[in-house]
């Protein structure tokens, strides 16, 4: 008898109820009592097992991106970029790779409306022949802060007040008033794109700068872009109240129903690349996650397409237990020194170990679909089958060897230990350009949202003045407009 | 140096940032990198500690009642019931006991709108001189099922579909079509009361039948009622969409803002009592949680008042970590053989051990405020200070003794091991009476909500017929009304 053969699964259902040890249950309606009306006996093991499992159904939600929906499909290469990367899954046009995607909101809890003004997560796990590749991004191309050391405090400011549990603008505007690097992100969040219509009608971005490396070891910086073929659509504030008030899961339902109806959402993948030798020629730092790369100088190059054509079988197994991590890459793709990405490499796996346990990468949705081998598997809920006697390395009894060497970025690292900001901050140019690119009604809505936020009675005169100063530095007329609505004089 | 003196607290804040071991942090903005733009060093312990704590901020939400708000105040006895109970906190009019209360919705997740049609939790923890007393009830006086064996499946049916994560009527109406005992609960849930305006404008109930015992050992069955002095107010469907769409935390905010403004919500406590000698004289079983006790025969007796006059200091400590359990009673209050209550005695503590750890009753919000003593404290996160050498019982070195004996119900339990339903089900009378007591517009709204639910395209003809038959048995005109809207003929 092989204990690993009949793994627990819907495929091995008995036609009658049983306990988890397989004992038959002849009455699943009534507890075991003293007589028909007396108290329940402790020996009612079936009842205790049923309740104890139920009592433990919830695991910690994600500290961010708790609310989300997932779906499966494939990625297909449409354009050859093998001169840029040796990644196997990108080796030639026509190559398809299975994947799972999770869309999410960021700040609020599981169950929160999917109509809140918030970035949307856009995380893709490619099950490649060289192991999984997680491209863990958002629907906005930039981020609030450029060093992950600020991330926990940033999230605390955006989350509900720890006393009242209400999200409050004075806390958000206080925190970010110390970090003008956030202006560019706010030019997305407070724009109409701050509330996407649903998960199908939005673009995605890798957000951070990554590195592509080809077989010869040549590295280029890269940014990833997913463009929806459904068109970008957003909800204005009044629509969001009605949609979210009627169904707080409208985007989850939209994704599921679309796929069930055979209306498969699709995104095109594009990249922008930058030779590290040219990185000093820009007026911004290409490792600064608060910047976009101008598409007229660094054009979008098509790579492939992603189609979501299959709904998940079970929400808990393939959404709640689905774990992404930007550290999970494949040969031919590497990190950059982007300080936000560097911290993400640590945090994601760390938080999944808390949520799911040390063996979370064994869970079906997370495990690689290629052959793999190491000695990291004992501990809570190891359900892997291994029959080796040698579980150490190196050994003269075990022929397993190192994999073939994969190229890593060749640049020499040098410098003192530093805790400092980057030099080329350039916080105001891109948000100003973005604002000026809009028609006047879109500018008006943006201004109104800022006026609303700054009108929180607990926002002080000092904080209001700082923000007016910041927006004036991005665009003089924008700062003046906000100030005049608030009856304040801009400080510069 | 006493390691138990300076417990971590806002009261011992340093004026500058430190790590959790107390080391000063001289730069909380930037990670430790190789040069100004290089990768982050593993030795940046401060960064790793900050991220690792952040990564673990969430704990499992409650499997039910995840979404809620809490507040503190006091309970004051206004009427003497010391002839019914020897409970110290009920000993005489004028006696005040500090309390913490948690209101909640039941089915949806932590961030879900507080405008959904759902029962509302109403849980009160009394910090008495004889230990804590948890009265863990709801805003509706009855419950869906009368044996807790059905509870996990019931919640699964009410929760979102495990595939698409959307709450669906066909699953709810399928499950409950097997249990007509749920009809009475549905006359509350699908009534206007199903969406309270907020937590202040609703009543509360102990729901289950408990036992009061006086000094002489005489026991009476008891039901607890909390009557709001603010008046009961509900949201109709259109209002709920607007309120919940505009603020998914409106009830949390209302409770917090009311108390902050000095507008303290208040409830009066009433009891109904039945002498167990008379329990066979009714056409229902008084241990059946799907029944109310008619107030014309068993009148409400006033006991005291509950005033909430203080907001919590911290949402995580006093809401997320706040743990209730109906097993937590004081001398003079006891359980009954109500099969729902019997299972709750096990489940609540079991679930909190999963969520919070084995020492959850040491957490400040959960710990008794009276002197207490036992040997149950080691294990994860034991932070109690104990300096005894004898941590076993009995001992000739330790003078600790048994407490004074307090009375428990004197009834003799006898009977065979049984797994069965109760005899006097009487599922249709009370729901029918309740329906007939309403004005016609309220009856219409109730019928319309049933027609909407039964119109789910996945509700089969069989399920529709079962429900029409059930409602016809409660009230013939109600069944006909639903049937005619659905163009289905009633079966009886």
UniProtKB/Swiss-Prot annotation, chain A:
InterPro entries per the UniProt record, alphabetical: Catalase, Catalase_AS, Catalase_clade1/3, Catalase_core, Catalase_haem_BS, Catalase_immune_responsive, Catalase_sf
Protein localization: Peroxisome; Glyoxysome
Enzyme Commission code: 1.11.1.6
Assigned GO CC terms: cytoplasm; glyoxysome; peroxisome; plasma membrane
Family: Belongs to the catalase family.
Subunit organization: Homotetramer.
Protein name in the entry: Catalase-3
Annotated source species: Glycine max
Organism placement in taxonomy: Eukaryota, Viridiplantae, Streptophyta, Embryophyta, Tracheophyta
Gene: CAT3
Curated annotation (Swiss-Prot), chain B:
PROSITE patterns registered for this protein in UniProt: CATALASE_1, CATALASE_2, CATALASE_3
Binding sites annotated in the UniProt record for heme: 348
Top enzyme category: oxidoreductase
Matches recorded under SMART domains: Catalase
Record key words, sorted: Glyoxysome, Heme, Hydrogen peroxide, Iron, Metal-binding, Oxidoreductase, Peroxidase, Peroxisome
Catalysed reactions, as listed in the record: 2 H2O2 = O2 + 2 H2O
An annotated Gene Ontology molecular function: heme binding
InterPro entries assigned: Catalase (IPR018028), Catalase_AS (IPR024708), Catalase_clade1/3 (IPR024711), Catalase_core (IPR011614), Catalase_haem_BS (IPR002226), Catalase_immune_responsive (IPR010582), Catalase_sf (IPR020835)
CC terms in the record's Gene Ontology section: cytoplasm; glyoxysome; peroxisome; plasma membrane
Subcellular location: Peroxisome; Glyoxysome
Single biological process term from Gene Ontology: hydrogen peroxide catabolic process
EC number: 1.11.1.6
Pfam families: Catalase, Catalase-rel
Active site: 65, 138
Keyword match Cell wall biogenesis/degradation: no
Cofactor list: heme
Subunit structure: Homotetramer.
PANTHER family: CATALASE, CATALASE-2
Physiological role: Occurs in almost all aerobically respiring organisms and serves to protect cells from the toxic effects of hydrogen peroxide.
Family label: Belongs to the catalase family.
Protein name as annotated: Catalase-4
Organism, scientific name: Glycine max (Soybean)
Gene for this chain: CAT4
């Amino acid at each position: 008898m092989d204990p690993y053969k009949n793994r627990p699964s819907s495929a091995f259902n008995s036609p009658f109820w049983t306990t988890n040890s397989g004992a038959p249950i002849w009455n699943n309606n009534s507890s075991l009592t003293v007589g028909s009306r007396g108290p329940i006996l402790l020996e009612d093991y079936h009842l205790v097992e049923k309740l104890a499992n139920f009592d433990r159904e919830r695991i910690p939600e994600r500290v961010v991106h708790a609310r989300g929906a997932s779906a499966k499909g494939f990625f297909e290469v449409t354009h050859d970029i093998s001169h840029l990367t040796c990644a196997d899954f990108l080796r030639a046009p026509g190559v398809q790779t299975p994947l799972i995607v999770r869309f999410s909101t960021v700040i609020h809890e599981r169950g929160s409306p999917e109509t809140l003004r918030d970035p949307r997560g856009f995380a893709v796990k490619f099950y490649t022949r060289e192991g999984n590749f997680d491209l863990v991004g958002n629907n906005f191309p930039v981020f609030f802060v450029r060093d992950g050391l600020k991330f926990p405090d940033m999230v605390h400011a955006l989350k509900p007040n720890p006393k009242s549990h209400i999200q409050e603008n004075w806390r958000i505007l206080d925190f970010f008033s110390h970090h003008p690097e956030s202006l560019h992100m706010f030019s997305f969040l407070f724009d109409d794109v701050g509330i996407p219509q649903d998960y199908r009608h939005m673009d995605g971005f890798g957000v951070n700068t990554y590195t592509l490396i080809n077989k010869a070891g040549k590295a280029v910086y890269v940014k990833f872009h997913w463009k929806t073929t459904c068109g970008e659509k957003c909800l204005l504030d009044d629509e969001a109240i009605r949609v979210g008030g009627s169904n707080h899961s409208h985007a989850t339902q939209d994704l599921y129903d679309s796929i069930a109806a055979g209306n498969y959402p699709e995104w095109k993948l594009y990249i922008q690349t930058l030779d590290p030798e040219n990185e000093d020629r820009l007026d911004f730092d290409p490792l600064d996650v608060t910047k976009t790369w101008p598409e007229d100088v660094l054009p979008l190059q098509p790579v492939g397409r992603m189609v979501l054509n299959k709904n998940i079988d079970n929400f808990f197994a393939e959404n709640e237990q689905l774990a992404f991590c930007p550290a999970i890459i494949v040969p031919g793709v590497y990190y950059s020194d982007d300080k936000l990405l560097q911290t993400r490499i640590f945090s994601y796996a760390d938080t999944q170990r808390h949520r799911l346990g040390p063996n979370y990468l064994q869970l079906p949705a997370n495990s690689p679909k290629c052959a793999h081998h190491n000695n990291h598997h004992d501990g809570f809920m190891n359900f892997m089958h291994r029959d080796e006697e040698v579980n150490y390395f190196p050994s003269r009894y075990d022929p397993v060897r190192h994999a073939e060497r994969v190229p890593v970025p060749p640049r020499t690292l040098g410098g003192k230990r530093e805790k400092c900001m980057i030099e080329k901050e350039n916080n105001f140019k891109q948000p100003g350009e973005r604002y000026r690119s809009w028609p006047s009604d879109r500018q008006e809505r943006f201004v109104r949202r800022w006026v609303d936020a700054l009108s929180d009675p607990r926002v002080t005169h000092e904080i209001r003045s700082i923000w007016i100063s910041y927006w004036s530095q991005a665009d003089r007329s924008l700062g003046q407009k906000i100030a005049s609505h608030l009856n304040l004089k801009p400080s510069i």
